[in-house]
Curated annotation (Swiss-Prot):
Matches recorded under Pfam families: Trm112p
Family: Belongs to the UPF0434 family.
GO CC terms: cytosol
Signal peptide: none
Superkingdom of origin: Bacteria
SUPFAM superfamilies to which the protein is assigned, alphabetical: Trm112p-like
The protein, known as: UPF0434 protein FTM_0733
Matches recorded under InterPro entries: Trm112-like
Organism of provenance: Francisella tularensis subsp. mediasiatica (strain FSC147)
Length: 62
């Protein structure tokens, strides 16, 4: 995924910065504990597509 995209994308719910999870191909919002999938190199920023994360999972992203 193009890292310059991270400079403009934010969480659609709270507008927080997102963290790239290369291994799982997700963009993580630590504030809302959500992981937005990246499919075929395209971030899917739909709330209904996001996966709820545990606090332990969120902590892996710094």
């Amino acid at each position: 995924m193009d890292h310059s995209v991270l400079n403009v994308l934010v969480c659609p719910i709270c507008k927080a910065n997102l963290y790239y999870g290369k291994e799982n191909q997700v963009l993580v919002c630590k504030a809302d504990k959500l992981a937005y999938p990246i499919r075929e190199n395209i971030p899917v920023m739909l709330v209904e597509e996001a996966k709820k994360m545990t606090l332990e999972e969120v902590k892996k992203y710094g």
